[in-house]
């Protein structure tokens, strides 16, 4: 494995660990709101809450990025990037559009 690949894997691991730690912290502070914000099912949220620090590090060491870009629909992404609604209304619109997306579950 070359230096670029090693650096990329280290960056992925860092992003994954940051994401997992943030998700756990969010879930501890406000479980229901965090499940909505993260797009987690109850089962996924419960599993994540039970993970030990060692398990988080092991999971973060995956070569795949664990968080998912939720704006995978072109129409949705373009609608949210247009500055036609303004601040608070734009944020409310984004929340409504995200709420319509199904929660992903670990298969």
UniProtKB/Swiss-Prot annotation:
> Where is it found, in Gene Ontology cellular component terms?
cytoplasm
Q: What keywords tag this UniProt record? A: Activator, Bacterial flagellum biogenesis, Cytoplasm, Disulfide bond, DNA-binding, Transcription, Transcription regulation
Q: Quote the entry's note on domains.
A: The C-terminal region contains a putative helix-turn-helix (HTH) motif, suggesting that this region may bind DNA.
Question: What lineage does UniProt assign to this protein's organism?
Answer: Bacteria, Pseudomonadati, Pseudomonadota, Betaproteobacteria, Burkholderiales
Looking up Pfam families in the UniProt record yields: FlhD
NCBIfam families the UniProt entry points to: PRK02909.1-1
Which family is this sequence assigned to? Belongs to the FlhD family.
What is the designated name of this protein?
Answer: Flagellar transcriptional regulator FlhD
**Job of this protein:** Functions in complex with FlhC as a master transcriptional regulator that regulates transcription of several flagellar and non-flagellar operons by binding to their promoter region. Activates expression of class 2 flagellar genes, including fliA, which is a flagellum-specific sigma factor that turns on the class 3 genes. Also regulates genes whose products function in a variety of physiological pathways.
Q: How does it assemble?
A: Homodimer; disulfide-linked. Forms a heterohexamer composed of two FlhC and four FlhD subunits. Each FlhC binds a FlhD dimer, forming a heterotrimer, and a hexamer assembles by dimerization of two heterotrimers.
One GO term (biological process): bacterial-type flagellum assembly
Give me the gene this protein comes from: flhD
Species this protein is from: Bordetella avium (strain 197N)
**SUPFAM superfamilies, sorted:** Flagellar transcriptional activator FlhD (SSF63592)
Q: Which Gene3D superfamilies match?
A: Flagellar transcriptional activator FlhD (1.10.4000.10)
């Amino acid at each position: 494995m070359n230096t670029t690949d090693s650096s990329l894997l280290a960056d992925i691991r860092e992003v994954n660990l940051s994401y997992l730690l943030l998700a756990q912290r969010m879930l501890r502070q406000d479980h229901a709101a965090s499940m909505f914000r993260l797009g987690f099912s109850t089962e996924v949220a419960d599993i994540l809450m039970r993970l030990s620090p060692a398990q988080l590090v092991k999971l973060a060491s995956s070569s795949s990025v664990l968080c998912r870009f939720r704006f995978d629909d072109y129409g949705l992404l373009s609608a949210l990037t247009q500055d036609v609604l303004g601040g608070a209304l734009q944020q409310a619109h984004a929340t409504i559009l995200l709420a319509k997306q199904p929660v992903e579950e670990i298969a």
